Amino acid sequence: MPSCPPAYSEQVRGDGDGWVVSDSGVAYWGRYGAAGLLLRAPRPDGTPAVLLQHRALWSHQGGTWGLPGGARDSHETPEQTAVRESSEEAGLSAERLEVRATVVTAEVCGVDDTHWTYTTVVADAGELLDTVPNRESAELRWVAENEVADLPLHPGFAASWQRLRTAPATVPLARCDERRQRLPRTIQIEAGVFLWCTPGDADQAPSPLGRRISSLL
């Protein structure tokens, strides 16, 4: 009895592996671009932590800290790439992640009319998840967001970090308000502006963006 042909996604799995060379001669990994997962989760005090990957020394830009991620395959969206790579490199389950936004943080014109992009997929987890590093990771670490810039970052991540980091915002909510269950979390208040929103008491003075934040919960 003939065997069934492999699913399309299995046939093309890995077809994104390869380099795109820019007009200036710099090589970028991913024939169809690349994507990485910027995952936040609340620390015990409610402030955000970011999951960072300490890249193995043998890898490209080894020894630096960045996001789990990699080459995008031809059949994938950036979100699918980032979630897949976070599973492969950090052992994360897609069911534990909530994607909040995608941001193209790098664009390059390559030779022969090729084009390369890096997409940062912003997501939240409800808690500091356990991780399982693969051989591409010397270490995986939850880092307090205000300490990320203190590490030796991957140059691409370092260049985009300022536009990806959050500002704190407290949302006044009654104790019985069911929206409390959705906090803390990341909210993109407008393109390139992210807030880390935590619940506050109903009698707290609302922030200037309070009404808009509430409408997005």
UniProtKB/Swiss-Prot annotation:
Lineage, broadest ranks: Bacteria, Bacillati, Actinomycetota, Actinomycetes, Mycobacteriales
Knockout or disruption consequences: No visible phenotype.
UniProt domain Nudix hydrolase: residue ranges: 30-164
UniProt-annotated stretches for the region Disordered: 67-92
Designated name of the protein: Putative 8-oxo-dGTP diphosphatase 3
Gene it is expressed from: mutT3
GO process terms (BP): DNA repair; DNA replication
Function of the molecule: May be involved in the GO system responsible for removing an oxidatively damaged form of guanine (7,8-dihydro-8-oxoguanine, 8-oxo-dGTP) from DNA and the nucleotide pool. 8-oxo-dGTP is inserted opposite dA and dC residues of template DNA with almost equal efficiency thus leading to A.T to G.C transversions. MutT specifically degrades 8-oxo-dGTP to the monophosphate.
Residue ranges of the motif Nudix box: 70-91
Organism: Mycobacterium tuberculosis (strain ATCC 25618 / H37Rv)
Co-factor requirement: Mg(2+); Mn(2+)
Catalytic reaction(s) noted: 8-oxo-dGTP + H2O = 8-oxo-dGMP + diphosphate + H(+)
CDD domains registered for this protein in UniProt: NUDIX_Hydrolase
Any further remark recorded for this protein: There are 4 mutT paralogs in M.tuberculosis; the exact function of each is unknown.
Positions of Mg(2+) binding: G70, E85, E88, E89
UniProt keyword annotation of Zinc-finger present: no
Domain of life, source organism: Bacteria
Alphabetical UniProt keywords: DNA damage, DNA repair, DNA replication, Hydrolase, Magnesium, Manganese, Metal-binding, Mutator protein
EC number: 3.6.1.55
A single MF term (Gene Ontology): 8-oxo-7,8-dihydrodeoxyguanosine triphosphate pyrophosphatase activity
Cysteine-cysteine disulfides: none
InterPro entries tied to this protein: Nudix_hydrolase, NUDIX_hydrolase-like_dom_sf, NUDIX_hydrolase_CS, NUDIX_hydrolase_dom
Sequence similarity: Belongs to the Nudix hydrolase family.
Xref: Gene3D superfamilies: Nucleoside Triphosphate Pyrophosphohydrolase
